[in-house]
């Protein structure tokens, strides 16, 4: 019943393109956790291991009871690589495989289904600010339940270390754990507006950062060797467009793509701008503009197989939407 309510929530988004991209990261992490013995067969069979995406611009991801995980589009939109997203998902997965959720909930004396359900709905449907997020959680007891799901420092360190092993064994770049921490730390210093709720439930300490830095191979580059790919830049742009579907925001994407300075920026930045503009124009039913921008995106991504596939999927979406409008 609780899960059915989650799927009916207006903040829940079922987008095939984003879901495929996330699953392409998530499934190798699950396989790695199984291979390492972190994910016990009993837990594996009993839990859902499913990611639910929320149409929310805040930077957040969280583990929920029963093997469900929440992922805000805001997080997909700010990470610079699939490896950084993998580091967050591996961390959240490890909270569950190490039974942190069950240990925290066991401390709640009134762990009735409605209380847990209210906490889940409030977390997934968190809106544009902390006050609104708390308002979505039914009753003072449910707010207390959410507060108890703030992980201890010991749990955070354990999830970091287990998650690090899971993601590296799955083939993702280990440096992404550090670059993601750097991104969160810098954003926490610059923003105190509630846009990073992830940091409230996952306190980032200098000890955690130092621990992940110490785990890097000797002589490793301080930055990600893979960098931003065209494909990830396009998927991140999609997440940003879908998380802020207002008319003014959609029009801003078109203006960005028409900028004279766009040709002088790196290819991933160009791909993101063009992809976002095509999707925005499609949503605005400006199909002529969308088709023109799509031609530029097609040319830019022609030599990159994964990016070219994203372009073809976008072209099919444009054609389908235009056909439905006629």
What are these regions (language model features)?
Residues 70-87, 149-154:
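Short pre-active-site segment immediately N-terminal to the catalytic Zn-binding motif
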Residues 13-32, 40-54, 110-116, 180-187:
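Acidic helix-start/capping segments at beta-turn-to-alpha-helix junctions
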Residues 70, 84-92, 96, 138:
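Short alpha-helical catalytic segment bearing the HExxH-like zincin motif
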Residues 1, 12, 20, 38, ...:
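Extracytoplasmic and endomembrane cell-envelope/extracellular-matrix remodeling and assembly machinery
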Residues 52-67:
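Catalytic zinc-binding patch centered on the HExxH motif and its immediate surroundings
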Residues 105-117, 132-135, 171-181:
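Acidic/histidine metal-binding catalytic segments
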Residues 113-128, 135-144:
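Membrane-active amphipathic alpha-helices enriched in small hydrophobic residues
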Residues 80-83, 93-110:
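Catalytic Zn2+-binding segment of zinc metalloproteases
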């Amino acid at each position: 019943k609780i899960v059915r309510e989650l799927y009916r929530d207006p903040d829940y988004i079922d987008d095939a393109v984003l879901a495929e991209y996330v699953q392409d990261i998530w499934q190798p992490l699950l396989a790695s956790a199984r291979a390492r013995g972190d994910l016990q067969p009993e837990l594996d069979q009993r839990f859902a291991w499913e990611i639910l995406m929320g149409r929310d611009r805040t930077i957040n991801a969280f583990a929920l009871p029963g093997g469900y995980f929440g992922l805000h589009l805001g997080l997909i939109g700010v990470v610079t690589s699939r490896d950084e997203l993998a580091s967050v998902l591996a961390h959240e997965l490890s909270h569950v495989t190490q039974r942190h959720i069950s240990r925290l909930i066991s401390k709640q004396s009134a762990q009735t289904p409605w209380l847990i359900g209210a906490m889940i709905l409030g977390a997934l449907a968190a809106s544009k600010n902390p006050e609104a997020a708390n308002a979505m959680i039914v009753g003072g007891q449910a707010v207390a339940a959410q507060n108890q799901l703030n992980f201890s420092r010991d749990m955070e360190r354990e999830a970091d270390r287990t998650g690090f092993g899971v993601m590296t064994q799955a083939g993702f770049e280990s440096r992404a754990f550090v670059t993601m921490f750097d991104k969160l730390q810098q954003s926490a210093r610059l923003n105190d507006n509630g846009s990073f709720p992830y940091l409230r439930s996952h306190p980032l300490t200098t000890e955690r950062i130092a621990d992940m830095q110490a785990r890097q191979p000797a002589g490793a580059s301080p930055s990600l060797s893979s960098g931003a790919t065209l494909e990830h830049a396009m998927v991140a742009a999609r997440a940003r467009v879908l998380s802020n579907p207002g008319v003014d925001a959609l029009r801003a994407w078109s203006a960005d793509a028409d900028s004279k300075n766009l040709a002088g920026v790196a290819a991933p930045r160009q791909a993101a701008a063009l992809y976002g503009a095509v999707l925005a124009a499609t949503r605005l039913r400006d199909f002529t503009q969308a088709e023109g921008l799509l031609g530029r995106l097609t040319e830019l991504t022609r030599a990159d197989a994964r990016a070219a596939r994203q372009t073809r999927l976008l072209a099919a979406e444009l054609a389908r939407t235009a056909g439905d409008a006629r």
